[in-house]
Amino acid sequence: MGFMTQKEMAPLPDVHQLSDEQTTLTVEHLNLYYGNKQALNDISIRIPKNQVTALIGPSGCGKSTLLRCFNRMNDLVDDCRTEGDIRLNGMPINDPQLDVAVLRRRIGMVFQRPNPFPKSIYENVIYGLRLQGLRDRRLLDDAVERALRAAALWHEVKDRLSDNALTLSSGQQQRLVIARAIAIEPEVLLLDEPTSALDPISTLIVEELMGTLKQHFTLVLVTHNMQQAARVSDYTAFINQGKLIEYNRTDDLFTSPTQRRTEDYITGRFG
């Protein structure tokens, strides 16, 4: 796969030596509470630019909660509060003066199950662009083709852009959702178990797509599939009980974990 070749050709910097220029998201001493229950405990992590970072851990460990901190999806949860600092290229994400809609244009998200709108394929892709006020048909056409090509879907749908998106297969729908997310050219793409509802062939297509997308975007992936994390990610963070247990280059974490809990998890002793 292309991204494996790139990983082999260019040694990745150590997670503890990432400069600000190499970092897209910076998290420092993050705590998150649902009411009186603490879900994230003193998490500090740097997410490198133009790489795939996987968040792994057992169900309920806090990895999806952490992911949703990056675009403030947790704001939608009643009685949720956060402490600490999260920055997107230096911009404080939790600033109460920040327009969350602007943040979510800079940080796109793809969920576990494909969620295309019950509109045409074309209208799905341009949805975010229309919200931004873009009306020029030529520019919209160009954006649709560019996004669908980037999502490896263009050749499958270019002659049926007016068809309802719900007529696509589940794998095609998920790639359409990715195209919709990247059409507005975000800096970061959050992927919350994006292949868990897909068949093996569709899963492989999406995994290969991640290797291409990271050339233009920073990707953060939540996955229960450790083999998937090992295949597609450059860096992996192991989270358990709301704490960051270990964070390292993926190859190092899976072959030479420094924490016993990490080794126990990746070898199947618990989780």
Swiss-Prot record:
One GO-annotated biological process of the protein: phosphate ion transmembrane transport
Superkingdom per UniProt: Bacteria
Heme recorded as keyword: no
UniProt-listed SUPFAM superfamilies: P-loop containing nucleoside triphosphate hydrolases
EC number: 7.3.2.1
Presence of keyword Cell membrane: yes
Membrane topology: Peripheral membrane protein
Domain ABC transporter: 25-266
Enzymatic reactions: phosphate(out) + ATP + H2O = ADP + 2 phosphate(in) + H(+)
PANTHER family the record matches: ABC TRANSPORTER I FAMILY MEMBER 17, IRON EXPORT ATP-BINDING PROTEIN FETA-RELATED
Function: Part of the ABC transporter complex PstSACB involved in phosphate import. Responsible for energy coupling to the transport system.
NCBIfam families attached to this UniProt entry: 3a0107s01c2
Subunit architecture: The complex is composed of two ATP-binding proteins (PstB), two transmembrane proteins (PstC and PstA) and a solute-binding protein (PstS).
Name the UniProt record assigns to this protein: Phosphate import ATP-binding protein PstB 1
